[in-house]
Amino acid sequence: MLMIARKALASAHTKAFRLATRDVHCFSSILVSPPLVSLDLPENWIPYSDPPPPVSFETEQKTVVIDGNVIAEEIRTKIISEVGKMKKAVGKVPGLAVVLVGEQRDSQTYVRNKIKACEETGIKSVLAELPEDCTEGQIISVLRKFNEDTSIHGILVQLPLPQHLNESKILNMVRLEKDVDGFHPLNVGNLAMRGREPLFVSCTPKGCVELLIRTGVEIAGKNAVVIGRSNIVGLPMSLLLQRHDATVSTVHAFTKDPEHITRKADIVIAAAGIPNLVRGSWLKPGAVVIDVGTTPVEDSSCEFGYRLVGDVCYEEALGVASAITPVPGGVGPMTITMLLCNTLEAAKRIFL
């Protein structure tokens, strides 16, 4: 019996591996992106204490503001149509499970927006909330339940987790075919390797590329700089841009003269999480800037007592960049929309 159980387990692992490595990245008509052709040291960025002098150029660049809300809405309209077709064909809809630990204000806001987006597009959503002091065992128990639930096609663990929890161990518990956040090591690894295709690409990088393409920005052959190298955005962003044939440089907290390197870029992806880190003087005139940063900064004049600030000094970038995403209203809506797309694709692999 033990031998049979071991063979069954080996067979299951083999099946999961084959799923991860074969070409199953099903691009529907929803997105315009084409098919995909030690970092443990702390990132201690040192932001400017005083703003640098204003940058002036002989001719001021007219900057296009890339509206992520409009582009996200176009994609969501198609998602609604696809979900409707699925429901009519098989009587089922995609299902997304979200695990939220603790009561961190920004995490609650992000989860609330994701649940709302599911409701608006016809995707079923289930929210599991656990206390700040919960154990890894409690979270893993919830994940196992969702892994076995056939009505759930995507599972998302809202990050960051409390410090006493092993983030890698918890994320690795999500079944590969339900890893709609694209954080599983096999998904990231297959993104990095030629001849391999991940089941899912991380939502924020995927949304950034979609924004670039829909704005008419050519990626192939361009010099791109990614500022930040987190597992969530920076690292997969660099890998994805390489898949689109960009020449990619990564700038991080240990980079010498980051301004000089960034100023060579045709495309700048700012994902360091440091408000106003990238000044106008960092940018090459005509560069396209995608600002991933969304740091909450206290502001009593705002409804919730804070406002979101990007990594790029927006006012200084205007007139230098040829195009830029605002914060908020740029990358954020696209990240959630790519989560919906990944959940839909996960369900399609089961039903269609």
Curated annotation (Swiss-Prot):
A Pfam match: THF_DHG_CYH
The protein's annotated pathway: One-carbon metabolism; tetrahydrofolate interconversion
EC number of this enzyme: 1.5.1.5, 3.5.4.9
GO biological process, one term: photorespiration
Main location per the UniProt record: mitochondrion
Localisation: Mitochondrion
SUPFAM superfamilies associated with the record: Aminoacid dehydrogenase-like, N-terminal domain, NAD(P)-binding Rossmann-fold domains
InterPro entries: Aminoacid_DH-like_N_sf, NAD(P)-bd_dom_sf, THF_DH/CycHdrlase, THF_DH/CycHdrlase_cat_dom, THF_DH/CycHdrlase_CS, THF_DH/CycHdrlase_NAD-bd_dom
Protein keywords: Hydrolase, Mitochondrion, Multifunctional enzyme, NADP, One-carbon metabolism, Oxidoreductase, Photorespiration, Transit peptide
Consequence of gene loss (knockout): No visible phenotype. Fold1, puru1 and puru2 triple mutant shows no photorespiratory phenotype.
A single MF term (Gene Ontology): methylenetetrahydrofolate dehydrogenase (NADP+) activity
Transit peptide per record: 1-23
Record's keyword annotation contains Aminoacyl-tRNA synthetase: no
Catalytic activity: (6R)-5,10-methylene-5,6,7,8-tetrahydrofolate + NADP(+) = (6R)-5,10-methenyltetrahydrofolate + NADPH; (6R)-5,10-methenyltetrahydrofolate + H2O = (6R)-10-formyltetrahydrofolate + H(+)
GO CC annotation: mitochondrion
Protein task: Catalyzes the oxidation of 5,10-methylenetetrahydrofolate to 5,10-methenyltetrahydrofolate and then the hydrolysis of 5,10-methenyltetrahydrofolate to 10-formyltetrahydrofolate.
Family: Belongs to the tetrahydrofolate dehydrogenase/cyclohydrolase family.
Subunit structure: Homodimer.
Name of the protein described by the UniProt record: Bifunctional protein FolD 1, mitochondrial
